[in-house]
Amino acid sequence: RDLGIRVIGSISKPINRSKIEALLDRVELKTAPPAKSFTQFELSEAEIRAGLAADAIRLVYQPKVDAVSLDMVGVEALLRWETPDGALLGPGAVVPVAERTGLMFTLTQAIFKAAMLQLSQWCQAGYRWKVSCNFSVSDLTESSIVRVLEDALTASGAPTDLVILEVTESKLSEDVSRVMSSLTRMRLKGCGISIDDFGTGFSSMEQLRRFPFTELK
């Protein structure tokens, strides 16, 4: 306790059966309280709008490591949301609401812009890590998606060959033609395309062959 460590019991060596039984006799079974509803942690539409205006988006980056060399070769940008009191919330508090209220594309634009600025800074420091950003099907069916991404790339100076657009496989069957058009246009500009959660959806191999993906996850 003096070290800030809490334990349910301890056994000194040598260990014998009587010591183990004595320790188990002290065990008290507890029932975990019911998990709070996930929706209790969701922000409101008004909070998201206010946060977007106040630049509440914070990104953390999950590293991707080469299995052979063990070198870090890239990162995936993950959303965190800073509340007015300084707390950081995960994407589950933001994304479902954004999808329901038509704010998803605005949110995605802000995330992509921030990620590209970070990528540009890393490149200037000599680190050429590929950066993956997640996109929803609703993002990829927006008529202005390619122009928006091009603008963010131009403004940041981030190299397109280090950018990976990531989309979940199970969503690829939604509005296939428009999604494929957006992905193909960005692939032609040099961006990589990643299919996330591969094998968990219902996409046929024939359909997957139509998409210009460069990696499967």
Indicate residue ranges for each PLM-predicted region:
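Catalytic core of bacterial c-di-GMP phosphodiesterases, primarily the EAL and HD-GYP domains
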Residues: 103-178
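C-terminal output helix
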Residues: 6, 15-24
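Hydrophobic faces of well-ordered beta-strands that scaffold small-molecule active sites
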Residues: 59, 75-79, 105-107, 131-133, ...
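The C-terminal output helix
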Residues: 24-40
